[in-house]
Regions:
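N-terminal leader/linker segments that initiate helical-solenoid repeat arrays
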Residues: 3-56
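Terminal, low-structured helical/coil segments at or just beyond the last alpha-helical repeat
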Residues: 8, 151-193
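Alpha-helical adaptor scaffolds
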Residues: 25, 56-126, 148-151
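Short helix-adjacent coil turns
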Residues: 31, 65, 103, 137-138
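Charge-rich, solvent-exposed alpha-helical interaction surfaces
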Residues: 36-39, 53-56, 73, 111, ...
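Flexible helix-coil transition and linker loops at the boundaries of alpha-helical arrays
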Residues: 38-47, 79-86, 156-159
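Conserved positions within tetratricopeptide repeat
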Residues: 71, 109-110, 140-147, 175-180
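Short N-proximal segments of mature Sec-exported proteins
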Residues: 123-137
Length: 193
């Protein structure tokens, strides 16, 4: 337990910052399936938006259940960017979500934890960390991180009915899990600090 706990910093009091890098990396739009993969491979070969194409191809591979290939492509994309830069942060954020969706909750949390030092205090961190920590059965830490979301925006995060608006890209299953965290927070809200 203690080795895993070291991978996540303690929550700060507030997380108001917007993180413009917390968006999907997209090099090619309007295509799906094999046509999308073909265009992404061509973009990589031409060197146009090569890093973005590699990251999007990694996402496609992970979504298709090809975790090893997806991870290899994500690492290539990350290795081609400036550590801590906007594109690096965006790729890391996406990689974390793909790891999470693959059931690799600890790996996702570790990936996202790297972003805490690179980004400061973006508002996506508390609910995302709470979700991953809850999935890892680290309930007390999850509730503490959820508390940071509530301290930041108390009118938004104290009602699970807001989750579909606050987290439109999250799967309903993940919003339901976060509602469990909210329930635990309501039962015993942690004090600050």
């Amino acid at each position: 337990f203690s080795a895993h706990a070291q991978s996540v910093p303690k929550p700060k009091e507030f997380y108001f910052d917007e993180d413009r890098a917390a968006t999907p990396v997209v090099a090619v739009t309007g295509l799906a399936g094999d046509a999308l993969v073909d265009e992404l491979v061509k973009a990589r070969e031409r060197g146009r938006k090569m890093v973005e194409a590699t990251a999007q191809l990694a996402h496609v591979a992970m979504a298709d259940g090809r975790r090893d290939l997806g991870s290899q492509l994500y690492e290539q994309a990350l290795g081609s960017t400036q550590s801590g830069g906007h594109l690096w942060r965006s790729i890391s954020w996406n990689y974390g979500w793909d790891l999470y969706r693959a059931g690799e909750h600890q790996s996702a949390l570790t990936r996202w934890a790297q972003l805490v030092t690179a980004t400061g205090g973006p508002s996506w961190i508390p609910p995302t960390f709470a979700l991953a920590l809850w999935k890892l059965d680290r309930k007390a830490e999850a509730v503490a991180w959820y508390g940071a979301a509530v301290r930041t925006e108390p009118t938004l995060w104290t009602d699970a009915r807001n989750f579909s608006t606050l987290l439109p890209d999250w799967a309903q299953e993940d919003r339901d899990t976060l509602a469990e965290v909210l329930g635990a927070w309501q039962a015993n809200p942690p004090t600050w600090p």
